[in-house]
Protein backbone atom coordinates (compact mmCIF):
# COMPACT_ATOMS: atom_id res chain seq x y z
CA UNK A 1 0.00 0.00 0.00
CA UNK A 2 1.13 3.54 -0.76
CA UNK A 3 0.32 6.38 1.63
CA UNK A 4 0.80 9.92 0.31
CA UNK A 5 0.77 12.25 3.36
CA UNK A 6 0.19 15.78 2.09
CA UNK A 7 -0.32 19.04 3.96
CA UNK A 8 -3.90 20.09 3.20
CA UNK A 9 -7.09 19.36 1.27
CA UNK A 10 -6.04 21.43 -1.74
CA UNK A 11 -2.88 19.38 -2.15
CA UNK A 12 -4.87 16.15 -1.89
CA UNK A 13 -7.17 17.41 -4.65
CA UNK A 14 -4.35 18.49 -6.95
CA UNK A 15 -2.32 15.33 -6.43
CA UNK A 16 -5.25 12.95 -6.94
CA UNK A 17 -6.52 14.82 -10.01
CA UNK A 18 -3.07 14.82 -11.59
CA UNK A 19 -2.73 11.10 -10.85
CA UNK A 20 -6.02 10.34 -12.62
CA UNK A 21 -5.11 12.50 -15.61
CA UNK A 22 -1.69 10.87 -15.91
CA UNK A 23 -3.23 7.40 -15.78
CA UNK A 24 -5.77 8.28 -18.50
CA UNK A 25 -3.13 9.81 -20.75
CA UNK A 26 -0.70 6.92 -20.27
CA UNK A 27 -3.48 4.51 -21.22
CA UNK A 28 -4.23 6.44 -24.44
CA UNK A 29 -7.92 5.42 -24.52
CA UNK A 30 -9.92 5.03 -27.73
CA UNK A 31 -13.57 4.34 -28.55
CA UNK A 32 -12.78 0.63 -28.80
CA UNK A 33 -10.45 0.63 -25.79
CA UNK A 34 -11.76 3.07 -23.17
CA UNK A 35 -10.23 3.86 -19.82
CA UNK A 36 -12.60 2.67 -17.06
CA UNK A 37 -12.75 4.95 -14.02
CA UNK A 38 -14.61 4.35 -10.76
CA UNK A 39 -15.95 7.44 -8.99
CA UNK A 40 -17.34 8.43 -5.56
CA UNK A 41 -19.65 11.14 -4.28
CA UNK A 42 -19.64 13.05 -0.99
CA UNK A 43 -17.70 16.02 0.27
CA UNK A 44 -14.18 14.60 0.08
CA UNK A 45 -13.83 14.30 -3.73
CA UNK A 46 -15.39 17.68 -4.55
CA UNK A 47 -12.09 19.53 -4.80
CA UNK A 48 -10.62 16.68 -6.86
CA UNK A 49 -13.48 17.07 -9.33
CA UNK A 50 -12.80 20.81 -9.45
CA UNK A 51 -9.14 20.12 -10.17
CA UNK A 52 -10.03 17.59 -12.89
CA UNK A 53 -12.30 20.17 -14.55
CA UNK A 54 -9.46 22.71 -14.48
CA UNK A 55 -7.09 20.21 -16.11
CA UNK A 56 -9.71 19.42 -18.74
CA UNK A 57 -10.25 23.11 -19.51
CA UNK A 58 -6.48 23.54 -19.78
CA UNK A 59 -6.46 20.90 -22.50
CA UNK A 60 -4.46 18.39 -20.47
CA UNK A 61 -7.01 15.57 -20.61
CA UNK A 62 -10.10 14.39 -22.48
CA UNK A 63 -12.84 12.23 -20.99
CA UNK A 64 -14.35 11.37 -24.39
CA UNK A 65 -13.11 7.79 -24.21
CA UNK A 66 -13.45 7.35 -20.44
CA UNK A 67 -16.16 5.06 -19.06
CA UNK A 68 -17.25 5.74 -15.48
CA UNK A 69 -18.89 3.62 -12.82
CA UNK A 70 -20.12 5.28 -9.65
CA UNK A 71 -19.91 3.58 -6.29
CA UNK A 72 -23.48 3.89 -5.08
CA UNK A 73 -26.92 5.48 -5.17
CA UNK A 74 -29.78 5.95 -2.73
CA UNK A 75 -32.84 3.71 -3.04
CA UNK A 76 -36.11 5.48 -3.76
CA UNK A 77 -34.66 8.93 -4.43
CA UNK A 78 -35.61 10.20 -7.93
CA UNK A 79 -32.65 10.84 -10.24
CA UNK A 80 -33.76 14.48 -10.48
CA UNK A 81 -33.67 14.97 -6.70
CA UNK A 82 -30.93 17.51 -5.87
CA UNK A 83 -29.33 15.09 -3.39
CA UNK A 84 -29.36 12.01 -5.63
CA UNK A 85 -25.92 10.87 -6.66
CA UNK A 86 -27.00 11.24 -10.29
CA UNK A 87 -27.57 14.95 -9.65
CA UNK A 88 -24.34 15.24 -7.68
CA UNK A 89 -22.19 13.79 -10.45
CA UNK A 90 -23.67 15.89 -13.23
CA UNK A 91 -23.58 19.09 -11.19
CA UNK A 92 -20.05 18.65 -9.90
CA UNK A 93 -18.31 16.88 -12.76
CA UNK A 94 -20.03 15.42 -15.83
CA UNK A 95 -21.64 18.68 -16.99
CA UNK A 96 -18.22 20.34 -17.13
CA UNK A 97 -16.19 17.85 -19.20
CA UNK A 98 -16.49 16.07 -22.54
CA UNK A 99 -17.58 12.66 -21.25
CA UNK A 100 -20.14 10.90 -23.44
CA UNK A 101 -23.54 10.22 -21.88
CA UNK A 102 -23.42 6.58 -23.00
CA UNK A 103 -20.22 6.08 -20.99
CA UNK A 104 -21.72 7.16 -17.65
CA UNK A 105 -22.86 4.35 -15.35
CA UNK A 106 -24.69 4.99 -12.08
CA UNK A 107 -26.80 2.49 -10.16
CA UNK A 108 -30.56 2.97 -10.50
CA UNK A 109 -32.17 3.03 -7.07
CA UNK A 110 -35.70 3.19 -8.48
CA UNK A 111 -36.10 -0.19 -10.17
CA UNK A 112 -38.64 -2.78 -9.06
CA UNK A 113 -35.94 -5.44 -8.70
CA UNK A 114 -32.87 -4.16 -6.85
CA UNK A 115 -31.07 -7.50 -6.99
CA UNK A 116 -31.41 -7.60 -10.77
CA UNK A 117 -30.12 -4.03 -11.03
CA UNK A 118 -27.08 -4.91 -8.92
CA UNK A 119 -26.37 -7.99 -11.03
CA UNK A 120 -26.71 -5.91 -14.20
CA UNK A 121 -24.17 -3.43 -12.83
CA UNK A 122 -21.66 -6.17 -12.02
CA UNK A 123 -22.06 -7.63 -15.51
CA UNK A 124 -21.65 -4.19 -17.10
CA UNK A 125 -18.35 -3.74 -15.26
CA UNK A 126 -17.18 -7.18 -16.39
CA UNK A 127 -18.10 -6.36 -19.98
CA UNK A 128 -15.25 -3.83 -19.94
CA UNK A 129 -12.85 -6.33 -18.41
CA UNK A 130 -12.15 -4.38 -15.24
CA UNK A 131 -12.12 -0.93 -13.72
CA UNK A 132 -8.65 0.50 -14.28
CA UNK A 133 -8.69 3.02 -11.44
CA UNK A 134 -11.29 3.38 -8.70
CA UNK A 135 -11.23 6.59 -6.67
CA UNK A 136 -13.08 6.60 -3.37
CA UNK A 137 -13.48 8.27 -0.02
CA UNK A 138 -13.92 6.79 3.44
CA UNK A 139 -16.47 7.31 6.20
CA UNK A 140 -15.73 8.24 9.80
CA UNK A 141 -16.36 4.60 10.70
CA UNK A 142 -14.10 3.33 7.94
CA UNK A 143 -16.79 2.42 5.42
CA UNK A 144 -16.09 2.57 1.70
CA UNK A 145 -19.03 3.32 -0.61
CA UNK A 146 -21.99 2.12 1.50
CA UNK A 147 -20.17 -0.96 2.78
CA UNK A 148 -21.00 -0.27 6.40
CA UNK A 149 -19.11 -1.86 9.34
CA UNK A 150 -19.35 -5.69 9.34
CA UNK A 151 -19.84 -5.85 5.57
CA UNK A 152 -18.33 -8.90 3.92
CA UNK A 153 -14.91 -8.13 2.51
CA UNK A 154 -15.76 -10.28 -0.52
CA UNK A 155 -19.17 -8.64 -1.09
CA UNK A 156 -20.52 -7.68 -4.51
CA UNK A 157 -22.91 -4.94 -5.61
CA UNK A 158 -26.09 -5.15 -3.52
CA UNK A 159 -28.67 -3.26 -1.46
CA UNK A 160 -27.56 -2.15 2.00
CA UNK A 161 -29.33 -0.75 5.04
CA UNK A 162 -27.60 2.44 6.16
CA UNK A 163 -26.42 2.71 9.75
CA UNK A 164 -27.62 5.38 12.15
CA UNK A 165 -24.18 7.01 12.01
CA UNK A 166 -24.37 7.27 8.21
CA UNK A 167 -27.90 8.64 8.32
CA UNK A 168 -26.83 11.30 10.79
CA UNK A 169 -23.70 12.16 8.78
CA UNK A 170 -25.68 12.48 5.54
CA UNK A 171 -28.52 14.46 7.11
CA UNK A 172 -26.46 17.62 6.46
CA UNK A 173 -27.51 17.23 2.82
CA UNK A 174 -31.18 16.84 3.78
CA UNK A 175 -31.92 19.98 5.81
CA UNK A 176 -30.26 18.33 8.83
CA UNK A 177 -33.33 16.11 9.11
CA UNK A 178 -32.29 12.48 9.55
CA UNK A 179 -35.83 11.37 8.67
CA UNK A 180 -35.39 12.72 5.13
CA UNK A 181 -32.31 10.59 4.44
CA UNK A 182 -33.08 7.39 2.47
CA UNK A 183 -32.64 4.32 4.68
CA UNK A 184 -31.27 2.09 1.92
CA UNK A 185 -28.74 2.36 -0.87
CA UNK A 186 -27.37 0.29 -3.72
CA UNK A 187 -23.61 -0.01 -3.48
CA UNK A 188 -20.70 -1.77 -5.06
CA UNK A 189 -19.24 -4.43 -2.77
CA UNK A 190 -15.83 -4.51 -1.16
CA UNK A 191 -14.98 -7.35 -3.52
CA UNK A 192 -16.11 -5.25 -6.47
CA UNK A 193 -13.74 -2.48 -5.39
CA UNK A 194 -10.84 -4.87 -4.86
CA UNK A 195 -11.31 -6.21 -8.40
CA UNK A 196 -10.18 -2.83 -9.76
CA UNK A 197 -6.67 -2.72 -11.18
CA UNK A 198 -5.86 0.21 -8.93
CA UNK A 199 -7.67 1.84 -5.99
CA UNK A 200 -7.06 5.39 -4.76
CA UNK A 201 -8.76 6.47 -1.53
CA UNK A 202 -8.89 10.10 -0.37
CA UNK A 203 -8.85 10.72 3.39
CA UNK A 204 -9.10 14.27 4.73
CA UNK A 205 -9.89 15.89 8.06
CA UNK A 206 -9.48 15.13 11.76
CA UNK A 207 -12.74 13.18 11.79
CA UNK A 208 -11.23 10.57 9.45
CA UNK A 209 -8.09 10.03 11.54
CA UNK A 210 -9.29 6.83 13.23
CA UNK A 211 -10.31 5.36 9.90
CA UNK A 212 -6.88 6.14 8.43
CA UNK A 213 -5.14 4.63 11.43
CA UNK A 214 -7.18 1.44 11.02
CA UNK A 215 -6.45 1.31 7.29
CA UNK A 216 -2.69 1.74 7.63
CA UNK A 217 -1.72 0.36 11.04
CA UNK A 218 -4.63 -1.88 11.96
CA UNK A 219 -5.35 -5.47 11.02
CA UNK A 220 -7.80 -6.50 8.31
CA UNK A 221 -11.19 -6.27 9.99
CA UNK A 222 -14.71 -6.29 8.57
CA UNK A 223 -15.74 -3.68 11.15
CA UNK A 224 -13.42 -1.27 9.32
CA UNK A 225 -14.04 -2.09 5.67
CA UNK A 226 -11.30 0.32 4.56
CA UNK A 227 -8.76 -2.18 5.95
CA UNK A 228 -9.54 -4.44 2.97
CA UNK A 229 -7.20 -2.16 1.00
CA UNK A 230 -4.32 -4.00 2.66
CA UNK A 231 -5.15 -6.97 0.43
CA UNK A 232 -4.98 -4.97 -2.78
CA UNK A 233 -1.86 -5.09 -4.95
CA UNK A 234 -2.07 -1.44 -6.00
CA UNK A 235 -3.79 0.61 -3.31
CA UNK A 236 -3.02 4.27 -2.70
CA UNK A 237 -4.27 6.43 0.16
CA UNK A 238 -3.90 10.18 -0.31
CA UNK A 239 -4.40 12.13 2.92
CA UNK A 240 -3.96 15.53 4.50
CA UNK A 241 -2.13 16.31 7.74
CA UNK A 242 -5.21 16.42 10.01
CA UNK A 243 -6.14 12.87 8.95
CA UNK A 244 -2.77 11.54 10.16
CA UNK A 245 -3.29 12.55 13.81
CA UNK A 246 -3.91 8.98 15.02
CA UNK A 247 -0.96 7.48 13.13
CA UNK A 248 2.31 6.77 14.91
CA UNK A 249 4.98 9.40 14.32
CA UNK A 250 7.30 6.78 12.83
CA UNK A 251 4.57 5.67 10.40
CA UNK A 252 4.11 9.18 9.05
CA UNK A 253 7.89 9.65 8.91
CA UNK A 254 8.32 6.38 7.00
CA UNK A 255 5.80 7.24 4.30
CA UNK A 256 6.93 10.88 4.11
CA UNK A 257 10.45 9.70 3.30
CA UNK A 258 9.28 6.89 1.02
CA UNK A 259 6.99 9.16 -1.01
CA UNK A 260 9.20 12.26 -0.95
CA UNK A 261 9.20 12.68 -4.73
CA UNK A 262 5.41 12.27 -4.94
CA UNK A 263 4.93 14.82 -2.16
CA UNK A 264 7.27 17.30 -3.85
CA UNK A 265 5.30 17.04 -7.08
CA UNK A 266 2.43 19.07 -5.64
CA UNK A 267 2.57 22.57 -4.20
Curated annotation (Swiss-Prot):
Keyword check for Hydrolase: yes
Query: InterPro entries under this entry?
Result: Glc/Gal-6P_isomerase, Glucosamine6P_isomerase, Glucosamine6P_isomerase_CS, NagB/RpiA_transferase-like
Kindly list the GO molecular function terms attached to this UniProt entry.
glucosamine-6-phosphate deaminase activity; identical protein binding
Note whether Ribosomal protein occurs among the keywords.
Answer: no
Paired cysteines (S-S): none
Q: Which CDD domains match?
A: GlcN6P_deaminase
The UniProt keyword set, sorted, is: Allosteric enzyme, Carbohydrate metabolism, Hydrolase
Instruction: Please summarize the record's notes on activators and inhibitors of this protein.
Output: Allosterically activated by N-acetylglucosamine 6-phosphate (GlcNAc6P).
What pathway does the UniProt record associate with this protein?
Answer: Amino-sugar metabolism; N-acetylneuraminate degradation; D-fructose 6-phosphate from N-acetylneuraminate: step 5/5
Q: Where is this site: Part of the allosteric site?
A: 151, 158, 160-161, 254
Q: Which GO terms describe its cellular component?
A: cytoplasm
What's the superkingdom here? Bacteria
Instruction: Please cite one Gene Ontology biological process associated with this protein.
Output: glucosamine catabolic process
Q: What does this protein do?
A: Catalyzes the reversible isomerization-deamination of glucosamine 6-phosphate (GlcN6P) to form fructose 6-phosphate (Fru6P) and ammonium ion.
Assembly and interaction partners: Homohexamer.
Q: Which family does it belong to?
A: Belongs to the glucosamine/galactosamine-6-phosphate isomerase family. NagB subfamily.
The name this protein carries in UniProt is Glucosamine-6-phosphate deaminase
What's the gene?
A: nagB
Amino acid sequence: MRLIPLHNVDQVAKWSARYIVDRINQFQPTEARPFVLGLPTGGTPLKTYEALIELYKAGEVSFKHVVTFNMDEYVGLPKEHPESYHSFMYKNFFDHVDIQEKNINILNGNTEDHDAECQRYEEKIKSYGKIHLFMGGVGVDGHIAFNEPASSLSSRTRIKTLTEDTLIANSRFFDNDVNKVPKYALTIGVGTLLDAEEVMILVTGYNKAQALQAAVEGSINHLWTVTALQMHRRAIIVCDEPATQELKVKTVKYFTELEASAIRSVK
